[in-house]
Amino acid sequence: QWLTRNSEMSKFEGVVWNNVLVGCGSNVKGVEKGWPYAANTVVEKTPEEVEKPFLTVNDGKYSVFVPKVKNNTVGVSWSGDKVDGEFIDLDKFYVAKPGDSVAKINSQLNAGKNLILTPGIYSLDAPIEIKNEDTIVLGLGYATLKPTNGNECMKVADVGGVSIAGVLFDAGQVNSSTLLTVGTAGNKTSHKDNPITLCDTFYRVGGADETPGKATTCVIINSSDVIGDNFWVWRADHGKGVAWTKNTADHGVIINGDNVTTYGLMVEHFQKYQTMWNGNGGKCYMYQSELPYDIPNQSSWNASGSYGYTDYKVAGNVTSHE
């Protein structure tokens, strides 16, 4: 259950479960044998490489570097003298802190600012709304968004170039229909030339405190051409406030957009389908999942016309999926 992406190495050994190498070339020793002879999958080139934005300082001046999305890559992206991307001055960002109101954050976003979420827990009585193209949202230190009124944590309009990175979406006590929604249902606008990217995003339902979290679905992706890198989507199976009827959550991920690509999609313990993929042209490089452990009886866990739920469900009308 391991993904290595865009790395350079001479040898990889010690594989037990599924081991996936993407964009690491074809000459890595130790992974020559693939399935079904060994638990290795090697994809020589990364079809669409996205790296998360990061905070940097040059000559005492802070900025955020936003790497450019690149196609068909092998190896690390930073080996040369010049790395493709853009430096954005810190004055183009609103630097938020826990306790800031949603109204204040949204006002800054509507004015054209990007957003840095400093470490801490943000209690939200309404969703943070991303409406402008090319908006950067960068969380530091596992910045955590937690709804208080059964609202979403964040809504992203169907606009290109948005980047969400380093954010934990944590379900609140009142059930939320979703924690993150990307795009609007039914919209088929292509963003191939300027995709929305989701890097190092984490979704949690319960487990952190005695107040059980609740969410129907953690993340719904309606936009097309979205690239996701490192999703951890978890209905708690241990910790505090955990039980079948306490931290309730039907689904981890629902993907309705076309041509969505994920690298490292990990979804665990939801009470119906873990992942539902309804869009065409989807690609998933390394999937890890666990079904719920706490099912009380068969009648509590039956899909229509069958016993139990498929873990990774691709809709019947989908004609292409990898």
Protein language model regions, located:
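Extracellular/periplasmic carbohydrate-active domains that bind, remodel
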Residues: 1-322
